[in-house]
């Protein structure tokens, strides 16, 4: 039987080794998403058969992530354990945000399978080289914005952010709040969650950076490396500085 524990800040270091090598290339397969959005996803975790098993509760319906294997993990065995757990509880196994490469394996396990393709849940996936160079006509708009920003902000630089930059970050959030125009509860909640995730830089789980100009941060970002994919959890910038978002 699986024994689930709610995701907390203290549990992130337990989850991180699995996500660190996760090849699925989906933002939901990251410790940052599970923690930042724990209030919405109600994520819980368990370990079985050398795999991390995540159970979310979305709109009151328990839904599993696809198992994330560790070095000696057996995904097929973990799926069987999930099936047995659901059978004992009298519920059908539901998996959400299944990697495309693994969906066919699930379809072959059961005589009846329903697969739903939710376009709104799809991630944006970019090649690192594309974002490094913005080459070609497709990225001409981004290049123009970046050139404008660099012209108007000579000396601006991208710097890594750690707990040593706490004062810079605190000043940035004050500046950002002054420009923040969104009044919806969802937008305000997302901002609070972003600030909270930045407060955990001391855990060494994330990579953060920002654009510094004349002693002030104009933009910040926080990401998490999962396998060969850098999952960007947060991007915030001061709208009053045109071109700063593409530059970030």
Locate the predicted segments by residue.
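Short, extreme N-terminal leader segments that mark the start of a protein/domain
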Residues: 1-21
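Short N-terminal binding/cap micro-motifs at the start of the first secondary-structure element
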Residues: 12, 25-28
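Conserved donor-binding loop and adjoining core beta-sheet/short helix segment
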Residues: 17, 28-99, 212-239
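Residues that form generic nucleotide/phosphate-binding pockets
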Residues: 18-21, 81, 85, 106, ...
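Active-site rim helix/loop that mediates acceptor-substrate recognition in acyltransferases
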Residues: 27-45, 186-205
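Short, glycine/charge-rich beta-strand/loop segments that flank catalytic centers
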Residues: 91-109, 120-122
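Acyltransferase donor/substrate-recognition loop-hinge adjacent to the catalytic core
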Residues: 111-183
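Accessory, usually C-terminal, subdomains that scaffold auxiliary metal cofactors
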Residues: 179, 189-248
């Amino acid at each position: 039987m699986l024994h689930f524990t709610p995701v907390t800040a203290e549990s992130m270091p337990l989850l991180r080794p699995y996500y660190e090598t996760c090849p699925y290339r989906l933002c939901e397969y990251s410790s940052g998403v599970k923690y930042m959005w724990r209030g919405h996803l109600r994520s819980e975790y368990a370990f079985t058969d050398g795999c991390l098993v995540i159970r979310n509760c979305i709109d009151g319906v328990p839904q599993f992530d696809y198992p994330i294997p560790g070095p000696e993990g057996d995904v097929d065995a973990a799926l069987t354990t999930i099936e047995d757990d659901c059978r004992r509880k009298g519920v059908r196994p539901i998996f959400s945000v299944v990697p495309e490469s693994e969906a066919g394996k699930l379809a072959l396990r059961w005589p009846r399978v329903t697969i739903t393709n939710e376009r709104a849940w799809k991630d944006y996936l970019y090649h690192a080289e594309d974002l490094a160079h913005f080459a070609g006509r497709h990225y001409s708009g981004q290049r123009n914005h970046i050139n404008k920003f660099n012209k108007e902000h000579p000396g601006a630089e991208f710097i890594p952010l750690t707990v040593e930059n706490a004062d810079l970050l605190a000043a940035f959030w004050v500046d950002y709040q002054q420009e923040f125009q969104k009044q919806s509860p969802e937008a305000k909640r997302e901002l609070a969650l972003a600030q909270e995730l930045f407060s955990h830089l001391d855990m060494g789980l994330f990579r953060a950076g920002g654009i510094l100009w004349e002693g002030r941060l104009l933009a910040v970002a926080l990401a998490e490396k999962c396998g060969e994919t850098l999952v960007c959890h947060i991007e915030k910038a001061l709208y009053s500085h045109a071109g700063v978002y593409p530059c970030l």
